[in-house]
Curated annotation (Swiss-Prot):
Region span, Disordered: 66-86, 249-307, 490-513
Gene behind this protein: sox13
DNA-binding region: 392-460
Entries under Pfam families matching the protein: HMG_box
Organism: Xenopus laevis
Protein name per the record: Transcription factor Sox-13
Membrane spanning stretches: none
Keywords, sorted A to Z: DNA-binding, Nucleus, Transcription, Transcription regulation
GO terms, molecular function: DNA-binding transcription factor activity, RNA polymerase II-specific; RNA polymerase II cis-regulatory region sequence-specific DNA binding; sequence-specific DNA binding
Compartmental location: Nucleus
Tissue specificity remark: Expression is highest in the ovary, with weak expression in other adult tissues.
Matching PROSITE patterns: HMG_BOX_2
Length: 567
């Protein structure tokens, strides 16, 4: 058997190496009995692209009768009709297989197969350099792909980390918001508790600062405790002078009453905002005209019978409340004291008549004028105690609200501490406090200022101007003027003490009766000396009242001198 063998190797533009081997055996056909051309084609394709496995295609086909006639000559004695049918079948199979072959082969495959191509076969064979180049390109592409993969993985991890961070931030924000809400709730609870404490302290302050009803001292058999007095509703006491007769209070009982009143004053906490007590609340004080003038009034009154004394014993005690235990106790004490002192008055009535007859009319007029002067001074002092009537106080600031309770605590611990020392301690404590500790007191200040504004919408703060006094042609400050008047009062008192012996500030009925039991001449001498002492004391009281009133009046006269107070 004779064969024709050829090999085709080429590299097309799409970087594919194709190798075609054609082996054409020439053998007689068994069916036809004549020679037949059988073409065996091996096709090898090597792909340079990554991930593509080379594909080997092997196809067997029978060539057409024309190509077979060119390559070999027919042999045998086959009939012509069978040969034509076979040729038709071959042409059909070749025509069906050619489109598939043309996809893998170039246009000049026939020329290359027949050896008519001008290009040498050595140009189409693959070399080692081209293979190394292609391997290098493949390695570079693999390296680039691994780098891209790493970048994608890092970006994915960064995105995942960013999402985790955002989630953590959201959780932190939620925790902060919850903590803030809890802190706000705690602060609100603390504010409510502090407001409750402030309200409780205000109630305690109002209970402590309620005015006390001063009761005259009674004998030990009929003492009245002050506990039921605090439980009862306290009614306002009018500040009007009430005439208390001398027989009501014994000298020893008066001393006890003054001591008890002082003890009550010191035991009470200091109240800077409270008004000074009126003179009628202290019946034992030496400044009230009724007690000081009662001996002379009894001398000038003429006859005094039991009916008039009983009328004086029934004092107007309606302001204490009718049916009150205190009122009943006072009335019983007055009746007891009146019963003890009625018999000596009847015995000494004649001596009083003789004493009044012996006194000159001028002394009686002086005594009455002194009585009116002291009454006017009492009214002036009451006006001063009333803070000039229409004066409106400023609302308390935060420091005053805080210092009110702290001052009370310090006074309870140290009752004898001076007010200036307490103020220094409170000022240093207030400066050392933080803003959070001061906050409730500032809120209380705002509440008080709003309340003050609602109560007095037209209020305007008008501070007192600094004033000076012109005394004997010299301009003096108010403090210097007060010191000068104090020295003058001391001089007048020292002169009075040298001229006449000292006497008690208040006269009792028993001391006067003891003096009247002596001779009438000695009584005259004692009455004159008592009038002298009273005149000196009244002059001192006049100076004190003028000193007190120096801030409110434009001009004050002292010892015949014109004193002008200027701004």
């Amino acid at each position: 058997m004779d064969t024709i063998q050829g090999e085709l190797v080429y590299c097309p533009a799409n970087e594919q190496e194709c190798r075609i081997s054609a082996k054409i055996p020439i053998s007689p056909s068994e069916d036809t009995g004549g020679p037949c051309l059988k073409v065996e084609e091996d096709y090898e394709e090597v792909s340079l692209q990554t991930g593509i496995v080379p594909v080997f295609i092997k196809q067997d086909y029978e060539s057409s009768s024309q190509d077979a006639n060119d390559l070999c000559k027919p042999q045998g004695d086959a009939p012509a009709s069978d040969r034509k049918e076979e040729n038709l079948k071959l042409s059909k199979t070749v025509s069906d297989a050619m489109p598939a072959l043309e996809k893998f082969l170039s246009n000049d495959w026939k020329e290359i197969l027949l050896g008519n191509s001008t290009v040498g076969s050595k140009d189409f064979k693959g070399t080692k350099e081209s293979l190394a180049e292609k391997e290098l390109q493949l390695l570079l592409m693999i390296h680039q792909l691994t780098g891209l993969r790493d970048q994608l993985l890092s970006a994915h991890s960064e995105h995942r980390n960013l999402a985790a961070m955002l989630f953590e931030k959201q959780q932190q924000q939620m925790d902060l918001a919850r903590q803030q809400q809890e802190q706000i709730a705690k602060q609100q609870q603390q504010l409510i508790q502090q407001q409750h404490k402030i309200n409780m302290l205000q109630q305690q302050i109002q209970q402590v600062n309620m005015p006390y009803v001063m009761i005259p001292a009674f004998p030990s058999a009929q003492t009245v405790s002050a506990e039921p007095q605090m439980s009862l509703p306290i009614q306002p006491i009018p500040c009007k002078p009430v005439e208390y007769p001398m027989p009501l209070l014994h000298n020893s009982h008066a001393g006890r009453g003054s001591a008890s009143a002082k003890h009550q004053e010191t035991s009470q906490p200091l109240n800077l905002t409270a008004k000074p007590k009126c003179p009628d609340q202290f019946p034992n004080s030496s400044s009230s005209p009724e007690f000081r003038m009662s001996p002379v009034g009894s001398q000038c009154g003429g006859t005094m019978d039991s009916a008039s004394s009983s009328q004086k014993a029934n004092l107007p005690l309606g302001f204490l409340g009718e049916g009150d235990a205190i009122t009943k106790a006072i009335q019983e004490a007055c009746q007891l004291l009146h019963g003890q002192n009625t018999s000596p008055e009847h015995c000494q009535q004649n001596y009083r008549k003789e004493l009044l007859d012996t006194l000159p009319e001028k002394n009686i007029q002086d005594v009455t004028s002194l009585h009116h002067t002291e009454a006017s001074l009492l009214r002036c002092s009451m006006d001063i105690d009333g803070s000039r009537g229409n004066h409106i106080k400023r609302p308390m600031n935060a420091f005053m609200v805080w210092a009110k309770d702290e001052r009370r605590k310090i006074l309870q611990a140290f009752p004898d501490m001076h007010n200036s020392s307490i103020s220094k301690i409170l000022g240093s404590r207030w400066k050392s406090m933080s803003n959070g500790e001061k906050q409730p007191y500032y809120e209380e200040q705002a509440r008080l200022s709003r309340q003050h504004l609602e109560r007095y919408p037209d209020y305007k703060y008008k501070p007192r101007p600094k004033r000076t006094c012109i005394v004997e042609g010299k301009r003096l400050r108010v403090g210097e003027y007060k010191a000068l008047m104090k020295n003058r009062r001391q001089d007048t008192r020292s002169l009075g003490s040298l001229q006449c012996p000292p006497s008690p500030s208040g006269f009792s009925s028993q001391s006067l009766l003891g003096n009247l039991s002596q001779s009438p001449q000695e009584c005259n001498i004692q009455v004159v000396t008592s009038q002298c002492l009273m005149s000196h004391e009244l002059h001192g009281a006049i100076h004190m009242a003028k000193d007190i009133c120096s801030d409110s009046e434009d001009s004050v006269k002292s010892d015949g001198e014109l004193v002008v107070i200027t701004d």
